[in-house]
Amino acid sequence: MIKDRDEYLNNVMKKILNSYSIIENLSDRPIDLELLEVEVRKINGFLLVLSKKVILLGNNSSNTKNLEKKIIFYMQNYDFSREINLLLDTYSEDSLRVRNIRDSVLKSLNENKLIQKIHDMSNNF
């Protein structure tokens, strides 16, 4: 059971890191804005799953509590869906705006060292 639980959490973390890597490697073309939207949605969904699973599985280590706090902070403070939709509707051809929103997404995930925490924990499973 514990191995399955840890494996499941590790898979969710790896999916978050994969989406983060995709966002990092976008080239700021108009089509990349659509990819950014998809990857941000994936990350948000996986963060919610990760947060809920950590709580439900009763893993109360300081590492998981710290991760949960970082996820809650991110979810409460960052939502790029409105901005991305606005850009898709009006400025999707402006590569500078695409780059700026991509940089904002990356910065938000690095703030409070959320991605670093996920990376470290996924390597320790």
Regions found by a protein language model. Give the residues of each.
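Short terminal alpha-helical segments
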Residues: M1-F46
